[in-house]
């Protein structure tokens, strides 16, 4: 541990650093010869610290370098007060008439863009201005050594402000272009490695103790419910108003109940950590804020918590008659496969009607008394002890799937349902789990009834709802609304009607207009005994307008005219694609970009959108093109954030990378059709041209940076591939966006 103290002073000029070098002198300064001059300079330093910031630049470098008192007294709030113009966060939009993909544009225009009003977050440009002013005020120019080094620091600060929630910033990014020879205060050290180590530690201290301290002290940094991983910066006074308003609204509505200090202590042993009470925080949404409580395990033993989650999931599966569960892609694929098969058997010709609804405040609307009543009725009808077997799906490769399937066992430890479903076969992977329903019910009741949170000195008890942040919150919410559908919506889920549910999102599809009207009336009225009310702004239908036949649900676009599921490419209108990925790779950037591009592409082309039982040739081409659209948007982000900062981009390498991913798309499509025992009639050249064409489309997208060299290289490849396309298949290429 070492530090440097100027002669004649008692305050350390440098903070403490951990150093691996053997040198004992960090900064070697010339010793003043005149004692009177030293005393005068010392008094000048102290006067400048007392007065503030006006005379700080006139103080010699040797006496104010990282003065601790000076740094502690600095407060950049006055800079914020001088900023009159507030920049709102803007989303990239696609201008009308600029592209020929009308289908995709219509889906994008149906998405409401977030609009922040008076409580808008600050733009990163404003925060950047504040931080640069702080660095100019505190750090003398001699520390940077040159304007080049200061520009590198500003570039690093800008990069930090634009990082995603889960991204990391490496010190190597900052030190890569720093000219250590310009830092004359460190040139007395002869070893280059020692100089670099010292400069790196100084720059690291500036980042942690000045830049990050200013961010923590002047801004509230949080994520947004609809902005994915992007960080938003609020003024603390503005965010405090939002926080107080959201908290008072929950107290006035009866969701939270105030407690005294003495009464709250009795609940502390049931919280996330023994003797501690979790603190509530809010995440901004379009209209209000979402409460988050880090309840986690809630004081329950891990083994009991594991059994409770499995038990609740099994209870939710028993409520199948109310709705088709579509929480993941596999469940939605099975439900849509059965429904399309039923419609094809009836030879339907009428148009389909749909009603989509969303529960307003799904987690906060759960009634504790109703939840306990539902659980009690289920527990009373079960045996004191249950055995659940652990199984997994056997894949075509001979390996076992990582996802565990739990099946109820009888007294002879035999599964209560078949382990073979068509070509799917389940194999046992572990010993049975013994579950005691009554014990789990008591634990859940204690957990839900005794939820206590804190907000500063205010202590509150959750009187209604389950907090988002608990381990069992999602399972309790799923069971609650599955029971509601079984009690109130089972009459609609018959015949050619289908009610899909993904936790709190509902989609009703029917051939009958009267049935659709009945469901719409039910959603408007809500379900009072479950305290369930639908969000009218998110409720839409095509009862009065049959032209609308596409509806987004559970991450896909449901086309009711062609009965196909399309890739949800219109999600690009929600925000900048950069914040949908984690960019934490420091080494091998080319391989990292290739891996991310492949992951983005294949994640969109799941068996859900490629199932040959309901996917036609036009739908397959549309999904491949849409996956190319999504991959192209993220490729631009990867080029801008990963490859461009390291120097000139090899565009031929990037074009070859896109083509290689296109060949993997062909193999993915073939694999899905092979598992469905269906011959693929579309040649590989058509699929490859479609995917690469989608990527080329994003290279000329109006609202994104353009890469003409990559676009040119890909077009050359497309021209060579077009010659190989059979004449009877060329008709698919000009109509890529069409789905009917």
Identify the meaning behind each predicted range:
Residues 150, 356, 368, 372, ...:
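Generic preference for well-ordered alpha-helical elements
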Residues 274-278, 350-355, 462-464, 468, ...:
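Core residues of folded domains in eukaryotic genome-function proteins
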Residues 316-317, 321, 346, 383-384, ...:
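Active-site palm subdomain of RNA-directed nucleic acid polymerases
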Residues 385, 519-521, 526, 530-533, ...:
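Catalytic lobes of large eukaryotic enzymes
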Residues 464, 525-533, 542-740:
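Active-site and adjacent loop segments of nucleotide-processing enzymes
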């Amino acid at each position: 541990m070492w530090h440097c103290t100027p002669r004649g002073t008692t305050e350390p000029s440098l903070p403490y650093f951990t150093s691996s070098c053997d040198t004992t002198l960090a900064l070697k300064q010339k010793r003043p010869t005149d004692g009177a001059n030293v005393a005068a300079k010392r008094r000048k330093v102290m006067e400048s610290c007392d007065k503030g910031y006006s005379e700080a630049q006139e103080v010699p470098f040797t006496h104010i370098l990282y003065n601790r008192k000076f740094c502690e007294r600095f407060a950049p709030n006055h800079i914020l007060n001088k900023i009159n113009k507030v920049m709102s966060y803007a989303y990239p939009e696609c201008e009308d008439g600029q592209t020929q993909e009308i289908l995709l544009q219509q889906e994008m225009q149906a998405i409401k863009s977030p609009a922040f009003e008076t409580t808008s977050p600050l733009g990163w440009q404003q925060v950047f201005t504040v931080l640069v002013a702080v660095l100019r005020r505190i750090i003398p120019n001699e520390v940077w050594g040159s304007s080049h080094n200061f520009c590198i620091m500003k570039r690093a600060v800008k990069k930090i402000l634009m990082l995603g929630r889960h991204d990391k910033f490496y010190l190597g990014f900052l030190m890569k272009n720093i000219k250590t020879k310009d830092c004359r205060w460190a040139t007395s050290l002869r070893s280059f490695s020692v100089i670099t180590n010292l400069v790196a530690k100084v720059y690291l201290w500036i980042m942690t103790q000045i830049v990050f301290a200013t961010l923590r002290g002047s801004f509230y940094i949080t994520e947004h419910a609809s902005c994915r991983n992007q960080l938003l910066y609020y003024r603390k006074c503005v965010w405090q108003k939002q926080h107080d308003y959201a908290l008072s609204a929950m107290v006035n509505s009866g969701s939270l109940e105030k407690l005294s200090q003495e009464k709250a202590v009795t609940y502390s042993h049931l919280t996330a950590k023994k003797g501690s009470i979790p603190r509530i925080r809010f995440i901004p949404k379009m209209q209000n804020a979402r409460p988050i409580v880090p309840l986690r395990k809630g004081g329950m033993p891990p083994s009991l918590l594991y059994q409770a989650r499995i038990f609740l999931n099994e209870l939710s599966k028993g409520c199948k008659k109310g709705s088709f569960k579509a929480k993941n892609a596999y469940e939605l694929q099975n439900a849509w496969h059965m429904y399309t098969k039923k419609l094809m058997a009836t030879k339907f010709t009428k148009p389909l009607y749909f009603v989509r609804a969303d529960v307003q405040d799904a987690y906060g609307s759960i009634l504790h008394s109703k939840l306990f009543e539902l659980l009690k009725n289920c527990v009373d009808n079960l045996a004191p002890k249950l055995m659940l077997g652990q199984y997994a799906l056997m894949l075509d490769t001979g390996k076992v799937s990582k996802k565990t399937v739990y099946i109820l066992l009888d007294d002879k430890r035999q599964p209560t349902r078949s382990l073979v479903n068509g070509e799917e076969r389940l194999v046992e992977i572990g010993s049975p789990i013994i579950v005691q329903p009554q014990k789990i019910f008591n634990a859940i009741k204690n957990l839900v009834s005794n939820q206590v949170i804190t907000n500063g000195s205010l202590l509150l008890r959750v009187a209604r709802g389950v907090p988002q942040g608990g381990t069992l919150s999602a399972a309790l919410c799923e069971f609650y609304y599955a029971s509601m559908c079984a009690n109130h919506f089972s009459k609609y889920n018959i015949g050619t009607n289908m009610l899909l549910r993904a936790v709190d999102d509902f989609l009703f599809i029917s051939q009958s207009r009267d049935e659709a009207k009945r469901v719409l009336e039910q959603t408007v009225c809500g379900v009072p005994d479950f305290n369930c009310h639908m969000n009218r702004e998110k409720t839409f239908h095509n009862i009065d307008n049959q032209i609308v036949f596409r509806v987004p649900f559970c991450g896909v676009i449901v086309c009711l005219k062609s009965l196909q599921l399309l890739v949800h490419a219109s999600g690009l209108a929600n925000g900048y694609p950069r914040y949908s990925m984690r960019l934490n790779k420091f080494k091998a950037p080319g391989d990292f970009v290739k891996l991310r591009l492949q992951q983005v592409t294949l994640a969109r082309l799941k068996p859900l959108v490629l199932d040959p039982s309901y996917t036609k040739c036009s739908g397959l081409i549309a999904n491949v093109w849409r996956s190319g659209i999504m991959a192209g948007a993220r490729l631009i982000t990867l080029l801008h954030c990963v490859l461009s900062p390291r120097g000139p981009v090899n565009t031929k390498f990037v074009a070859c990378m896109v083509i290689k991913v296109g060949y993997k798309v062909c193999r993915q499509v073939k694999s899905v059709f092979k598992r469905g025992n269906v011959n693929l009639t579309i040649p590989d050249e058509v699929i490859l041209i479609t995917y690469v064409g989608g990527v080329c489309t994003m290279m000329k997208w109006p609202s994104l940076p353009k890469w003409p060299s990559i676009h040119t290289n890909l077009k050359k490849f497309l021209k060579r591939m077009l010659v190989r396309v059979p004449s009877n298949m060329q008709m698919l290429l000009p109509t890529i966006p069409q789905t009917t």
